[in-house]
Amino acid sequence: MSSPAAQSNSSSSQSQSAAQQQQQQNQKANVNNTHDNKNAAATTGTAAGSGSGGAAGSAGTQQQGQGGTGTSSGPSSPTKRSTISTKERVIDSVAFPPSRKLTCADVFDARTGKPQHDVLKQHFILEGRIEESAALRIIQEGATLLRTEKTMIDIEAPVTVCGDIHGQFYDLMKLFEIGGSPATTKYLFLGDYVDRGYFSIECVLYLWSLKITYPQTLFLLRGNHECRHLTEYFTFKQECKIKYSERVYDACMDAFDCLPLAALMNQQFLCVHGGLSPEIHELEDIRRLDRFKEPPAFGPMCDLLWSDPLEDFGNEKNSDFYTHNSVRGCSYFYSYAACCDFLQNNNLLSIIRAHEAQDAGYRMYRKSQTTGFPSLITIFSAPNYLDVYNNKAAVLKYENNVMNIRQFNCSPHPYWLPNFMDVFTWSLPFVGEKVTEMLVNVLNICSDDELMTEESEEPLSDDEAALRKEVIRNKIRAIGKMARVFSVLREESESVLQLKGLTPTGALPLGALSGGKQSLKNAMQGFSPNHKITSFAEAKGLDAVNERMPPRRDATPSPAEEGQKSLSAAAAAAANANANSING
């Protein structure tokens, strides 16, 4: 058998000189050609011969394609390079979000004029959006309905009670799977539909569309996050501006002002977001409240949204009904005695509230001595809260005087960078690390004496020279420190993103980066430096700062607010005095 080069040349009618000339041209052309073009090689080999000769021709052409000379010398190993198409998505298994926004004609039924919530559901699951006009119409029509409802609404059983949602739209879909279709199930939501999660506007639009469609069987109460103060501080306002506009955000705030504050379920249960107030003694006190406003920093409306039961509820060390809520920075803690006193005075069985994350999704507190029923029930419906709590969620179904708790776990959801960060901002640490690394290397090339050299021939004194050298050294150290910060940001990007996700403003704790990996690790571990955030208690401890009422811009209260604050304090003191006299 002839050599591969000879086999290839034998199929050509060209002269020997022409073949040599062609071979030289191939050698010259292949100096810069390092790609393994197998398809072209196979085609050329087939044209060069058939059968075994064709295979030999193919081998010879492949060798020439790698820069070989076409001789019978040993073949060189091919250089393989992967190529990525710039016209196709790299991860094609993830569906691309719909690019077309739904119009009012798509969203609203032409016959009934009501939103098609099934259409919205499927569109939002795919991360689609709707036109601003459609979003505004849903929000405003929902607000019109909410405005007609009483401050404390009356609901008859059967009913399913749900706690905090916090923008976890995909878990809200799971909630309706567990609780039943809104078309056939009566629902009561206890507030906190927005903030912290990254799909808050989808939750609002979907729940409002359900409210418009089923106004007599779906009820929405106000939570402490349904206000301007918290949504500006946390994520909802930013989300509205990114996904829609500030006009949509303003419409949501106006709608939130219309939400009822409480519900009386089956004439037996008071349902509210937070809890009791020292200024609310009877149910009529709730009915008389003016709810159509931004919640104040203190007073009965604030307490209904912000108050909590004592941590040692049912095992208190003193007899006070109300104490200052140091965890929230506003409102009160209420005791077991205060709860039982309120229930007895209003002939109620229990208080059902939300407002606090629970490991199991719910908590039954100490039973009333008169009824034998839990005096207080907390329900929380956001599983794996903030993607770090690892808690279960729950809904409460009450029917035929039987209370049933149904738990559920979190559902997968699309990933957003913390605080809706874009990919360019996210990539800055990678770019910054390289820039500072280059700058440090440039500065390290020169010695201190070279950096001291100036055009001026005036000599510096020893003290001036030493001071100048120290200034230069400090600058190099500062740049080196900045380089370490960027290096930590790049290497520990996942930890940084998780820590940013736990802060409302997206700012990291001071010193978390400059101290290197260990300080970042300690910050991630929160209050337990020997453990990672793997338990519900540790996640709750780390997130406690975000459960407080954020500082207000107008920190100095108005005279009216001062008077209201004094009234609240006096009411709490009177309630505690009454409790002491009863116990005495």
Swiss-Prot record:
One Pfam family cited in the UniProt record for this chain: Metallophos
Phosphothreonine sites (modified residues): 61
Catalyzed reaction equations: O-phospho-L-seryl-[protein] + H2O = L-seryl-[protein] + phosphate; O-phospho-L-threonyl-[protein] + H2O = L-threonyl-[protein] + phosphate
The protein, known as: Serine/threonine-protein phosphatase 2B catalytic subunit 3
Domain of life, source organism: Eukaryota
Family per similarity comment: Belongs to the PPP phosphatase family. PP-2B subfamily.
Annotated residues for binding of Zn(2+): 192, 224, 273, 355
Bound cofactor: record note: Binds 1 Fe(3+) ion per subunit. Binds 1 zinc ion per subunit.
Bias-annotated ranges (Basic and acidic residues): 546-555
Keyword DNA repair found: no
Record-annotated active site: 225 (proton donor)
Gene Ontology BP terms: calcineurin-mediated signaling; sleep
Enzyme class: hydrolase
Database matches in InterPro entries: Calcineurin-like_PHP_ApaH, Metallo-depent_PP-like, MPP_PP2B, PP2B, Ser/Thr-sp_prot-phosphatase
EC number: 3.1.3.16
SMART domains: PP2Ac
Gene this chain is encoded by: CanA-14F
Annotated Fe cation binding sites: 164, 166, 192
Cofactor entry: Fe(3+); Zn(2+)
Subunit structure: Interacts with sra in a complex that contains Pp2B-14D.
Comp. bias intervals (Gly residues): 48-57
Keywords: Calcium, Calmodulin-binding, Hydrolase, Iron, Metal-binding, Phosphoprotein, Protein phosphatase, Zinc
Keyword Secreted: no
Gene3D superfamilies: 3.60.21.10
GO MF term set: calmodulin binding; calmodulin-dependent protein phosphatase activity; metal ion binding; protein serine/threonine phosphatase activity
